[in-house]
């Protein structure tokens, strides 16, 4: 288990003390994929640097499997770091080395014989989908293939934890999904704890099971991914969720004003579906019971590791009693309903 206990990190600057991380308390269970999401400057990277001992907390402690790594130094800290692999946005490959030689590099540093290092590197190349590309140089690889080399290299010393710091930020959407699928597969095969640092809720939604949202150095919200998607509490969380679920309405501070200006008539309703609800014809059944004119403004269904989450914006026009009946029906079907206006 990973635990952050009352962790604060302060940097001295000309303008005074800068609190990069403030009073963070967080638990990450073994074998989970835990996402930490926030915009630039939220404190995500500082937090992860404290996890592998590259930064020391100003106060508080970071504990991994009952070992307080903030008290370690020298050989003990180096031994602890060997239990943690890390992948980055920029691949940090050795351009004069082949794929296999890049994967072998940390094994050579660890003292493995060349024969054993090569054998293990070949296995890792196959694990990350690079069989047949072992003799290629980084300049001959696509961005996704380079990141696969980075992942294989991070796994070389059999870490218990894999840190991913914006590892898909430089990749196109299709390659991002392929790399995320690989990380999910590795998590399942190796029972590896993965900590994802990202500013993209898509990354969290696709493979994480738990998420913490950071803003201004603080964790403002945390919980199972599906629960956070279903009921975001903080403004920054709502913005992240809307960016993923309803991308064309991604600024929660202006969503309602935009909708009311564009659709001045009728009743504008936001529906949120969870799990099996997202697969059922609930809206069409509603229209059979309550004959209304319906305009679908925006919508989408996305999968998380714990189930589907769907969001739908509707414009309903017609008899007010019929509209009230329709909204009551949706609530009986356990669809979360928010009326943004009334005609």
From Swiss-Prot:
From the UniProt record, list the reaction(s) this protein catalyses. Answer: L-methionine(out) + ATP + H2O = L-methionine(in) + ADP + phosphate + H(+); D-methionine(out) + ATP + H2O = D-methionine(in) + ADP + phosphate + H(+)
What cellular-component terms does GO give this entry? Answer: plasma membrane
CDD domains reported for this sequence: ABC_MetN_methionine_transporter (cd03258)
Q: Name one GO molecular function term.
A: ABC-type D-methionine transporter activity
| Primary subcellular site in the record, as a coarse category | membrane
Q: Where in the cell is it found?
A: Cell membrane
Membrane topology type, per the record? Peripheral membrane protein
Q: Which PROSITE patterns match?
A: ABC_TRANSPORTER_1, ABC_TRANSPORTER_2, METN
Keyword annotations of the record:
Amino-acid transport, ATP-binding, Cell membrane, Membrane, Nucleotide-binding, Translocase, Transport
Disulfide pairs here are none
Q: What is its EC number?
A: 7.4.2.11
- In this chain the ABC transporter domain maps to 2-241
Q: Which family does it belong to?
A: Belongs to the ABC transporter superfamily. Methionine importer (TC 3.A.1.24) family.
Q: What does this protein do?
A: Part of the ABC transporter complex MetNIQ involved in methionine import. Responsible for energy coupling to the transport system.
The name under which this protein is listed is: Methionine import ATP-binding protein MetN 2
Taxonomy of origin reads: Bacteria, Bacillati, Bacillota, Bacilli, Lactobacillales
């Amino acid at each position: 288990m990973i635990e952050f206990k009352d962790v604060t990190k302060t940097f001295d600057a000309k303008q005074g003390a800068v609190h990069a991380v403030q009073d963070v308390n967080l638990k990450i269970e073994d074998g989970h994929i835990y996402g930490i999401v926030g915009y630039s400057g939220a404190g995500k990277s500082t937090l992860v640097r404290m996890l592998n001992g590259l930064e020391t907390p100003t106060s508080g402690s970071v504990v991994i499997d009952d070992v307080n790594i903030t008290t370690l130094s020298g050989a003990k800290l180096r031994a602890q770091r060997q239990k943690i692999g890390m992948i980055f946005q920029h691949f940090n490959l050795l351009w004069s080395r082949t794929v296999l030689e890049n994967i072998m590099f940390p094994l050579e540093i660890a003292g493995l014989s060349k024969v054993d290092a090569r054998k293990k590197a070949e296995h890792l190349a196959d694990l990350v989908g690079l069989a047949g590309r072992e003799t290629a140089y980084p300049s001959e690889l696509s961005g996704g293939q380079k990141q696969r080399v980075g992942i294989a290299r991070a796994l070389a010393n059999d870490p218990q934890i894999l840190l991913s710091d914006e590892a898909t930020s430089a990749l196109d959407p299709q390659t991002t999904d392929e790399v995320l699928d690989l990380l999910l597969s590795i998590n399942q095969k190796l029972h590896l704890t993965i900590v994802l640092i990202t500013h993209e809720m898509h990354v969290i939604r696709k493979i994480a099971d738990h998420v913490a949202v950071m803003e201004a150095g603080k964790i403002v919200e945390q919980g199972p991914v599906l629960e956070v998607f279903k009921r975001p509490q903080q403004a920054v969380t709502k913005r992240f969720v809307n960016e993923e679920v309803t991308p064309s309405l991604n600024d929660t501070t202006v969503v309602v004003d935009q909708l009311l200006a564009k659709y001045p008539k009728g009743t504008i309703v936001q529906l949120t579906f969870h799990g099996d609800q997202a697969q059922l014809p609930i809206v069409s059944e509603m229209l059979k019971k309550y004959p209304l004119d319906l305009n679908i403004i925006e919508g989408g269904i996305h999968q998380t590791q714990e189930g589907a989450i769907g969001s739908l914006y509707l414009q309903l026009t017609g008899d007010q009693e019929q509209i009230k009946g329709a909204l009551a029906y949706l609530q009986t079907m356990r669809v979360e309903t928010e009326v943004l206006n009334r005609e």
